[in-house]
Amino acid sequence: MNIAIIYGGKSSEHEVSLQSASSIIRTIDKKHKLHLIGISKNGAWYLHGDEERERIIKNEKAVLKIKKDEAKRVTVIPGGGAKKGLKAGDEFLPTDAVFAVLHGRFGEDGTIQGLFEMADLPYVGGDVMSTSISMDKEKTKMIWDYSGLPIVPYIAIKRQDWDDPEKKKAILARAEKDLEYPLFIKPCRAGSSVGAGMVKNRNELLEQAEESFLWDNKILVEACIEAREVECSVTGNTKTVAYIPGEIIPTHKFYDYEAKYTDPNGAELKIPADLNETQRKTIRETAIKAYEALDLSGLSRVDFFIDKRTGKIYLNEVNTIPGFTAISMFPKMCGASGLPYNELIMHLIELAIDRFKTDRKLKTCRQS
């Protein structure tokens, strides 16, 4: 099989993507041909040769690098002809499936998914609509709330409203009245907790809101509950499977970017999570409902809060391309349920091809 692995990207999670893709490359059987395509931080795509794959395989601590070789610039060819998909320089890259290991913006927001649709290529993960909605935390919460699923109280703020003095005054009054301090503020369309923070008073709220607005033009203000953080891996197209939940116990104030990726002691990961049977069942069932409410396919990691005081379970958010690093929860939870890393990766690729075949049966135009 010819598999394109795409990594890097124009995202705050560029470095995380390099780590995730490195782990995936190590686990794919060498009988499969890999096209390693690195996207620079300014958005240029470059093909990397087999020597990069060998370097990653031989050293478990090695991380992918992106070499800017203009002779290896990758272009995407729209479908409709005999040769479609991906091309590096003058070299056509036969591709059976694409695994875009891109976290955050331009990876989980429907943009690259639309590109693959136009190129007529099977790709891992949700489609354009489901990923774009799931990237927007406000829209995700609206759909979950409409579906009767439990969410933490919140308000969403747009940049233009925040910049209007009268609207800003009303927003602050509403946040303090309806939600009360402490509050948690984060960009609506960013990942890995970048631009996010907890605030205990108005001055901190004003400061944190400006930080969050650096990452998106819409931010979320949530009630901050003292909670356990539990996650659940989900895979599937028409048949959805939720795996054994895991728990994150941060040593930081909250599970921020440093705790996730740069501080080896940033959090304790417990798989399985210390839950009773009722809680475990509720989380797995709710994860499936949350996934299906968003019309997701392929894979996602669904994140939960469990209120330490009341025991109530809330949905937090969903990640349509979760981390695949050596310490990432998604593959570990699948592994704890009996699906080892190498089989998981091939399962996701098979799901991508299956969905592609199903979608190709649909009519796209009237026959003349």
From Swiss-Prot:
InterPro entries: ATP-grasp, ATP_grasp_subdomain_1, D-Ala_lig_Van_CS, D_ala_D_ala, Dala_Dala_lig_C, Dala_Dala_lig_N, PreATP-grasp_dom_sf. Pfam families: Dala_Dala_lig_C, Dala_Dala_lig_N. It is an enzyme of class 6 (ligase). Residues 141-350 form the ATP-grasp domain. Mg(2+) 2 binds at residues 317, 319. Gene3D superfamilies: 3.40.50.20, ATP-grasp fold, A domain (3.30.1490.20), ATP-grasp fold, B domain (3.30.470.20). The keyword DNA repair does not apply. Binds 2 magnesium or manganese ions per subunit. One of its GO terms (molecular function) is D-alanine-D-alanine ligase activity. Its cofactor is Mg(2+); Mn(2+). SUPFAM superfamilies: Glutathione synthetase ATP-binding domain-like, PreATP-grasp domain. Keywords: ATP-binding, Cell shape, Cell wall biogenesis/degradation, Cytoplasm, Ligase, Magnesium, Manganese, Metal-binding, Nucleotide-binding, Peptidoglycan synthesis. Its main location: cytoplasm. Belongs to the D-alanine--D-alanine ligase family. This is D-alanine--D-alanine ligase. The gene is ddl.
